[in-house]
Amino acid sequence: MSKNSKAYRAAAEKVDRSNLYTPLQAAKLAKETSSTKQDATVEVAIRLGVDPRKADQMVRGTVNLPHGTGKTARVAVFAVGEKADAAVAAGADIVGSDDLIEKIQGGFLDFDAAIATPDQMAKVGRIARVLGPRGLMPNPKTGTVTPDVAKAVADIKGGKINFRVDKQANLHFVIGKASFEENKLAENYGAAIDEVLRLKPSASKGRYLKKITVSTTTGPGIPVDPSVTRNFTEA
């Protein structure tokens, strides 16, 4: 939905920009202001009170959303032998080693997440410049460098999301689809916020959750009250 379209302007008029909504109210409003032509993704953007230029203020983590994301992620796995077989059995979409690396070097990027066994990381490092900027580089901190590839595949397929603060101290992550019931969106939101709060760097001073906005890919931003850090499904 173009921001200049009549439909977008009508949707934006439903949002009181001077108000801070509860997570449940924001979820309901996101559903109401989304385009009806497609099942839009519901996203959260957070401005954190950290300085991401400092190593001790980096915020990066994963969380399993209780109701999933509404999308079955395509997963690539770098593994060989029994580990490769386990990845295939767990539902990985593409599994390989040197052959997969060559395919990616040739432009293949038709996957949403990548997992690697530890012994494959020296090889995967050859495509770090391709995977890294796209948030696809396997990393032990997010559980995507692991000998237990079957569990990692199952977690991602089941609704596990990754998040990482960017250079402007913003976090972005998905909490579901506009077709979700608002209480399920609020519960997914709560699970993610709980993890973001748990990861607060000790070096972060002042307000940690400075600004939060919920929106769909086709709708306006909805300001959420950052002080609501429990009872996420209450209006």
From Swiss-Prot:
InterPro entries: Ribosom_uL1_bac-type (IPR005878), Ribosomal_uL1 (IPR002143), Ribosomal_uL1-like (IPR023674), Ribosomal_uL1/biogenesis (IPR028364), Ribosomal_uL1_3-a/b-sand (IPR016095), Ribosomal_uL1_CS (IPR023673)
A single BP term in Gene Ontology: translation
GO cellular component: large ribosomal subunit
Any one Pfam family match given in the protein's UniProt record, by short name: Ribosomal_L1
UniProt superkingdom: Bacteria
Family according to the record: Belongs to the universal ribosomal protein uL1 family.
Subunit organization: Part of the 50S ribosomal subunit.
Protein name, as recorded: Large ribosomal subunit protein uL1
Origin species: Mycobacterium marinum (strain ATCC BAA-535 / M)
Gene: rplA
